């Protein structure tokens, strides 16, 4: 029986993780849950899974949860704040930590799990986008094991030889016969929209992803393909890949989640229904296999799989991310932070869809900060980029 802490339990990955746990009650148990401000959903989760601990982002939410749990006679101990999330990530007796807190808020709790030597199921992109080298060094020093949750990275992981799986971030791709990692993306809801019409796209249109059910922020990132850009950066660190060993292609059906091309001409791919429960179940049970609850793939119903090269005029954020990755960790950190500010402004209808890339580009152009040597350095770059993006927003405000 594996004991888990779920960081970000009320988000879409957290909810899917709990669904997999519920489908396999003889294999997994919840020791601790951590979330932001969604008291209502956290209450339901605590009553269903009876964790020893739960944490909320602030004392107001924690107090509300505490009072409501007491009314039900639930014994879950409720904590508050970022340190509480870090403590729950490093709990004694916890085997696995699902790192699914979105954004820079997930950095320190994820790092706490790594330092504690846990098996870390990594769904927080920002950990590697902003702290790639720091995180991979910490993994090596602590003996922690990273298992990727993003459907693309999980697909790549499954398509790689075991020697690389066991030494993520350090094993040589070329020495293990790998020629190239092929990252696939659907192209989002605006794949066929005229580029001239993109400026008029609304938040609701951007969030209507054709294949995946996701949160609003990541849905917008899918529409701009910034999500694929962040995944590109993450894959470079996770699989120790050079720019020459990476390729991004559009695959509208989202059936092939990514591929690995080998020196002998073989290409290994992982296929499945677009359901996050599949990669979650794979990582939780690794190296075994368990029921995920995901629908089986019906090849006859799919009919055909198609592929396209990405159009960087349509997806300038993808190009920005690739360029930032080649520039360094300071640039990827700044880009990630600027993008969070720009997407939040777009979701509130303060700027146009095409302004997201413009704001991101301006922040990168203003960047003069050196490469980070610590998490504090990363957080400083993150704060600087957020302030710079907020200032730039005033020029685009509608």
Curated annotation (Swiss-Prot):
InterPro entries assigned to the protein according to its UniProt record, in alphabetical order: DXP_reductoisomerase (IPR003821), DXP_reductoisomerase_C (IPR013644), DXP_reductoisomerase_N (IPR013512), DXPR_C (IPR026877), DXPR_C_sf (IPR036169), NAD(P)-bd_dom_sf (IPR036291)
Task: Write out the entry's keywords from A to Z.
Answer: Isoprene biosynthesis, Manganese, Metal-binding, NADP, Oxidoreductase
Q: Which residues bind NADPH?
A: 10-13, 36, 38, 124, 126, 215
Instruction: Supply the enzyme class, top level.
Output: oxidoreductase
The organism's place on the tree of life at top rank:
Bacteria
* PANTHER family in alphabetical order: 1-DEOXY-D-XYLULOSE 5-PHOSPHATE REDUCTOISOMERASE, 1-DEOXY-D-XYLULOSE 5-PHOSPHATE REDUCTOISOMERASE, CHLOROPLASTIC
* Protein name according to UniProt: 1-deoxy-D-xylulose 5-phosphate reductoisomerase
Q: Which pathway is this protein engaged in? A: Isoprenoid biosynthesis; isopentenyl diphosphate biosynthesis via DXP pathway; isopentenyl diphosphate from 1-deoxy-D-xylulose 5-phosphate: step 1/6
The record's gene field reads dxr
Record's subunit section: Homodimer.
